[in-house]
């Protein structure tokens, strides 16, 4: 299949090329990873764990274990402020975020989720962490965050990343500890993982809402001269390419009165509108 797809690079994907979203989501909940296979264990790269439920490398047990490990890590580091959490448009991101919320709420972690029930680009979540920590009164517990995204990975993949109080990707000391602890929890059959039902987690006193979009878009003039862009009459075309920024571009144009057109606001977890690449 990959050889065939490589020969068709640059052409529109055929129905048989697209990931089966139903099978992907079923596997997320139904498949238990084989920890004897290194490819099915938790392994962090670029601050996060990535994989596919269809390959037994990104399934609910992974997310439950990683989230519990993050809870324990932030406790060891004295990080007791709110944890911002956001997700992208990959099919596995929403169920993974929900799994994480069940663990975070069970552990009494104050969590802030998107007030619009939408998608959160990584820069918007990083900005929320930095803004909170910068504006907090001295002695206020610091915030951190989780971004549920595999970034540029294929539609069948999921990703789960931890951002400490500096807002950027966690370093290897942090991710190494989190991965090791997560694998220990998996090996112990998830004993030690605290969890409550999703509805209880969403309605917990410790679960709140945060407007990531407004916070990010309204702060753009602090780093960009949007007056100069507007006064120059620049015409901007923005293609979110099915990513988490899909709702941000229109708001940027409207709130800052820019001549900006969103040319493709489609969100499709199969990315059927994309042409094939040579490698997958």
Predicted features along the sequence, with ranges:
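Phosphate-moiety recognition in structured ligand-binding domains
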Residues: 1-42, 56, 60, 65-68, ...
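Gly/Ser/Thr-enriched, mixed-charge loops and adjacent short helices
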Residues: 2-40, 138-139, 156-280
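N-terminal small/polar loop signature for handling phosphorylated ligands or for N-terminal nucleophile
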Residues: 15, 22, 76-80, 84-157, ...
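N-terminal glycine-rich anion-binding loops that anchor highly charged ligand groups
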Residues: 33-51, 69, 73, 77-78, ...
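Conserved phosphate/anionic-ligand binding catalytic regions in large, soluble enzymes, centered on
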Residues: 39-58, 150-153, 240-248
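Short glycine-rich or small-residue beta-strand-to-loop segments that form or flank ligand, phosphate
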Residues: 52-53, 82-88, 235-238
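Phosphate/oxyanion-binding active-site loops and adjacent basic polyanion-contact surfaces
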Residues: 58-71, 117-121, 209-217
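Glycine-rich phosphate/diphosphate-binding loops that line cofactor/substrate pockets in enzymes
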Residues: 67-83, 225-232
């Amino acid at each position: 299949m990959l050889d065939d797809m490589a020969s068709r690079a640059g052409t529109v994907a055929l129905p048989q090329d697209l990931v089966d979203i139903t099978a992907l989501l079923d596997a997320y909940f139904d498949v238990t990873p084989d920890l004897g296979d290194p490819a099915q264990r938790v392994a962090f790269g670029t601050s996060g764990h990535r994989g596919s439920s269809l390959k037994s490398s990104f399934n609910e047990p992974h997310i439950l274990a990683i989230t519990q490990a993050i809870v324990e890590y932030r406790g060891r580091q004295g990080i007791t402020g709110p944890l911002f959490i956001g997700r992208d448009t990959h099919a596995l991101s929403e169920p993974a975020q929900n799994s994480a919320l069940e663990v975070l709420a069970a552990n009494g972690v104050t969590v802030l989720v998107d007030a619009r029930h939408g998608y959160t680009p990584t820069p918007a979540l990083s900005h929320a962490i930095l803004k909170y920590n910068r504006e907090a009164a001295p002695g206020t517990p610091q915030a951190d965050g989780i971004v549920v995204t595999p970034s540029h990975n294929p539609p069948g993949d999921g990703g789960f990343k931890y951002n400490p109080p500096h807002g950027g990707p966690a370093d290897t000391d942090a991710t190494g500890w989190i991965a090791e602890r997560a694998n220990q929890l998996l090996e112990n059959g998830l004993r030690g993982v605290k969890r409550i039902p999703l509805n209880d987690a969403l309605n917990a006193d410790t679960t709140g809402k945060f407007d990531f979009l407004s916070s990010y878009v309204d702060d753009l003039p602090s780093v960009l001269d949007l007056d100069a862009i507007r006064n120059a009459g620049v015409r901007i075309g923005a293609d979110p390419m099915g990513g988490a920024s899909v709702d941000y571009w229109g708001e940027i144009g409207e709130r800052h009165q820019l001549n900006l057109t969103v040319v493709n606001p489609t969100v499709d977890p199969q990315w059927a509108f994309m042409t094939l690449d040579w490698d997958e």
